[in-house]
């Protein structure tokens, strides 16, 4: 379970990005984070992932997030995290080698579900296909 309690973030300029955010997400939950520009979506994600200092508490199953348990969180963004020069086949090989939690069967099933080509460079995919592939990678990373 991911718990956020009284999350606050103020930037050096004095701008308040997050104020008293509280959120509880059960394990296995898939959620979308939507809001207007400047609403704090990216700031919240960067706080959860440990990229920003913040005030408040963010825990996974009652433990502070560390490099050891962060792999239990997967996310997809509109700023694609895949390697454009690799094919999906190349991504599968990379993730299998580098991430113990990578779920190869789920990856293959989602590739089939989205009807994406395995041997074409991801950078040549349409925008919609790139978005599908981004979600597919997030769902295949063992969270």
Description of each model-found segment:
Residues 2, 16-18:
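Conserved structural motif at the start of ABC-family nucleotide-binding domains
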Residues 14-16, 67:
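Short coil-to-beta microelement around the adenine-binding A-loop and adjacent beta1/P-loop entry
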Residues 34-36:
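The feature captures the beta-strand-to-loop junction immediately N-terminal to the Walker
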Residues 50, 54-69:
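Conserved ABC transporter NBD signature motif
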Residues 77-133:
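ABC-family P-loop ATPase nucleotide-binding domains
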